[in-house]
Amino acid sequence: MKKKIIFLRNLGIEHWLTTFNKMNNFIISRNPCTYDEIWFVEHYPIFTQGQSNEQKNLIVSNDIPVVQTNRGGQITYHGPGQQILYFLIDLKRRKMNIRQLINIMEQTVIETLNNFSIQAYTKKKMPGVYINEKKICSLGLRIKKGFTLHGLALNVNMNLTPFNYIHPCGDKNMKMTQIKDFNSNVKLKDVRFILIKELSKFLEIFIINSN
């Protein structure tokens, strides 16, 4: 039973570095009996660069902090109104590979958007979720000793302007969108509720809310 239980934590809004340090401490301290966790959080404005990023993808920061991370992928923006999920998963214990986890993450977002009558899709060799050739959800993970860190960022109701200061995910032609563009009354808490519902379907687990 232990391997099926995931603790869900709603961290509210935090500075990226605060959450990053919590993730690292969690990974360092976890053992084979540690429950997996998924963290829901928003961040204050920040650009995060993945290990594959090239400096040319940052056009201008406009006084928004820029940090280098240890996740995969390239550069993206985080800000209030964006729902971030960090997946702290023991892949070996769940007999799951990284591609299977990414598929679960993407399909969870697609089904969540479907609840808002939004048709979304994935692209081969381009992780994330898209609507009408625009990106609404970015993914970036790291695996350390079989444990995952980082996760996904779903644009809900946020200021998208800072995405114009970068080449999102290293693509100068990439445009971003959000749920608000399709549903002006969307609330983050409603999206979070549906994400939890869809996650529980795909992972077939008990999700325990632990604030």
From Swiss-Prot:
The active site is at 169 (acyl-thioester intermediate). SUPFAM superfamilies: Class II aaRS and biotin synthetases. GO terms for cellular component: cytoplasm. GO terms for molecular function: lipoyl(octanoyl) transferase activity. Residues 32-207 form the BPL/LPL catalytic domain. The keyword Magnesium does not apply. It catalyses: octanoyl-[ACP] + L-lysyl-[protein] = N(6)-octanoyl-L-lysyl-[protein] + holo-[ACP] + H(+). It is an enzyme of class 2 (transferase). It is found in: Cytoplasm. Its EC number is 2.3.1.181. Substrate binds at residues 71-78, 138-140, 151-153. GO terms for biological process: protein modification process. Keywords: Acyltransferase, Cytoplasm, Transferase. The record marks 135 as: Lowers pKa of active site Cys. It comes from the Bacteria. The keyword rRNA processing does not apply. Pathway: Protein modification; protein lipoylation via endogenous pathway; protein N(6)-(lipoyl)lysine from octanoyl-[acyl-carrier-protein]: step 1/2. PANTHER family: LIPOYLTRANSFERASE 2, MITOCHONDRIAL-RELATED (PTHR10993:SF7), OCTANOYLTRANSFERASE (PTHR10993). In the reaction, the free carboxyl group of octanoic acid is attached via an amide linkage to the epsilon-amino group of a specific lysine residue of lipoyl domains of lipoate-dependent enzymes. Belongs to the LipB family. Catalyzes the transfer of endogenously produced octanoic acid from octanoyl-acyl-carrier-protein onto the lipoyl domains of lipoate-dependent enzymes. Lipoyl-ACP can also act as a substrate although octanoyl-ACP is likely to be the physiological substrate. This is Octanoyltransferase. It comes from Buchnera aphidicola subsp. Acyrthosiphon pisum (strain APS) (Acyrthosiphon pisum symbiotic bacterium).
